[in-house]
Structure formats: structure tokens, C-alpha cells
Amino acid sequence: MCILCDSAPALTELKIDIKAASLDQPEVIALITALNADLIERYPEDGSNHFRLDPEEVAPGRGVFLVAYVDGHPAGCGATRLIDPQTAEIKRMYVVPEFRGRGIAGRVLEGLERHARSLGARQIVLETGERQPEALALYTRAGFERIPLYGEYIDSPLSMCMGKPLHA
């Protein structure tokens, strides 16, 4: 089985399944490794300060890690976790380059927002950066707006935070 495919199916052939996954699954490890490499390439001066995700943060009742599968191949991922009873945070959003531009990130984001609502969150926030124009475009299309830096990102000059209310 291909962990991260070399060739993506044509757009007309896409069958996207979004499934909850644990952080120790081989395809999750491969996706996170690829995401980390992408972030290090975009932000070499930042090291890997913000690249962690504790399994407890995505444990049932606290969050979820979702994987998008296209025709059975892992194509993207994302996580959400509660940072307080009213606020969920999006983490670890990534789509394999061969699958980008096909709506996969939007499907993962929708699933994460649904899960955040199910946990009782009234708003959702995230951290990204200006060197991720595709992420900024996705989040803007999804209704996110810039917010002040928060939490571990307060002193990060490379960070850009966004958020939006979650309606029932």
C-alpha cells in the first residue's frame, strides 16, 4: 500500500473519505512527517517549535485527528482540540502536494468544525503564516478572519492567527 502516493487520481475519479485516526497509525505518521518537512522548508528560521501534537489533545471528548483518504490513499489531515470549553483550535492541516486543489482541505476543515461544535465549542481558532498562501485562501473562504496572536504564538513574529464563531 502506498503511504503517500506518487500519482494522484484524476479529479473526476476522486472518492474522498474522511475518517478519525490515531496519531500512531503509519499513514498519520507519514502525513505529519511530510507536514513538518513542508513547514521547515517554508519557515527554516522557526525550527520545529510548534510542530507538536499531544495524543491526549485529540483524545475522545477533547478533540479529533482526521485523515482524508482518496481512493484508499491518505491525501490530507487535520486536527482540532479544545483549548477551553468554548474554543476549539485547528492543528496540523495538510494535504499531500499531488492532491492539492481538489477540495480535500475544505472537506477536512468542515469535518473539524463539525467535531468542534459537537464538543460544545462556540468559536474556532488557528495559527498559520503568510508563507502559506494556500492555507490563508482556504481559511478566508471558510469565513475565518485575522485575530490577535494567542497562546504559544503571542511572541511569534512569523505567526498569523485566525478565528470565527461556530454556529449551531
Language-model region placement:
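Acetyl-CoA-dependent GNAT
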Residues: 13-91, 96-98, 109-111, 115, ...
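Ala/Thr-enriched low-complexity intrinsically disordered regions
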Residues: 8-12
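C-terminal "cap" of GNAT-fold acetyltransferases
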Residues: 13, 21-24, 31, 122-125, ...
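Conserved GNAT acetyl-CoA-binding A-motif
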Residues: 109, 116-127
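Active-site acidic-Proline motif in GNAT/NAT acetyltransferases
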Residues: 96-102, 130
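Cysteine-centered motifs
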Residues: 2-5
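Short coil/turn segments at alpha/beta junctions that flank glycine-rich nucleotide-binding fingerprints
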Residues: 86, 102, 118-122
